[in-house]
Amino acid sequence: MGSIGANNAVADPTPLFSSRVQKWEPGAIRSLLPLEALPGMISLVAGKPSPETFPIAEIAISLKDTPAGTGRIVVDGDELNQALQYGLPRGNAQLIQWFESLQRSVHGLDENGGWSCCIGNGSQELIHRVIQVFTDPGDPVLLETPAYPGVAGFLRADGQELIPVYSDAQGLNPASLEQALSEWPGDSPRPKVLYTTPTGSNPTGQSCTESRKAEILRLAKRFNFIILEDDAYYYLNYGDDKQRARSYLALERDVNGESGRVVRFDSLSKIVSPGMRLGILTAQAAVVDKVVRITENINLQPSSTTQLLALSLLRHWGQAGFLKHCAEAAEVYRRRRDVFVSAAERHLQGRATWVVPTAGMFVWLELKLPPEMDSFELLKSQGMKNGVLAIPGVAFMPGNEQTCYIRVSFSLVPERDMDEACRRIAGLVDRCACHS
């Protein structure tokens, strides 16, 4: 992986590209679509339906009264026709520009740093595409563990070798990462990617400290791998802003004197709407281009309609309004966390341990179970019977190891039910202890 330039060099990711991604060829039709915008061009290219056949006259959105502002957004005319028509594989150009401006403001990216953004149908689709860019079936992948099962699931189905890198209360542990890489067999290719969820991690709820991120970035340069920064909960950070860790994307230049090893994923799912299915990829242009090539050959594009709805909302808010909305959403989850943690302190002291999260919507409970019992068996045999459900820790273990952990989500359960939920979990632990 070479460098371009001297100061603030750009690491070239292309030597790490997989064999399979080279097989994707440009779509013969989709690659011509940007040329339709050239002045004076008469296009006979695309088999697009005529807008006069679209039955929708306008889309109107009424906004809630929030600190980000209120109002009504109407999409009609040519803009509506654009929202109902085929679009570009990379995504709506204006929406991409909006997010590129946000990344410069929030993460301090250079105007001409060789990076760009593209849009996907949710960040998980983009993560899957980037995995295809860098790995072939059977390749090893470094996976923050406990791991988000959505990604672990498709990695396992793709035949990848999952290499656990363990996290704790301070996030991903660089000592675990260094050990895995230092002890790697010399006759086997090293992993080329590390997947991590650094803020309000799903499932642990923990956030990686800035000092640890710096150590991990140094390891990425030393062992020549790419960091996949899945940061869906970044804007749901309700901790002390002064102690908030910068993103890997923001830190990379300061730590390593270069950029290009971090591929970042953002999402509107947790802060606007999961039903919109909009994710944002930020990476070196060569990586984005490969992702776009896969998109144009598989599902053509992200949804034009939801992209334009999102763009209309974000333009209405502006960056300041967007950040105000995110802060208000984070405050909602902070209050809900406080209610849940208070209930846990009343009922689960001595029965479980946990670390209070500073972002996201999860608490990772370590139940005090007998050695022969794991949380999956407990929930399967007693959870439904006693009217309480949570996700057993085995769901987040790449090797399906037994564990005494459970993941609880406080995002949707009514606050009035949190106390009873913790009381029922305590009852499960007590009954398990009595029968051991």
UniProtKB/Swiss-Prot annotation:
Its EC number is 2.6.1.28. Induction: Expression is positively regulated by the secondary metabolism regulator laeA. It holds the Pfam family Aminotran_1_2. Its cofactor is pyridoxal 5'-phosphate. Keywords: Aminotransferase, Pyridoxal phosphate, Transferase. InterPro entries: Aminotransferase_I/II_large, Class-I_PLP-dep_aminotransf, PyrdxlP-dep_Trfase, PyrdxlP-dep_Trfase_major. Belongs to the class-I pyridoxal-phosphate-dependent aminotransferase family. This is Aminotransferase tdiD. It comes from Emericella nidulans (strain FGSC A4 / ATCC 38163 / CBS 112.46 / NRRL 194 / M139). The gene is tdiD.
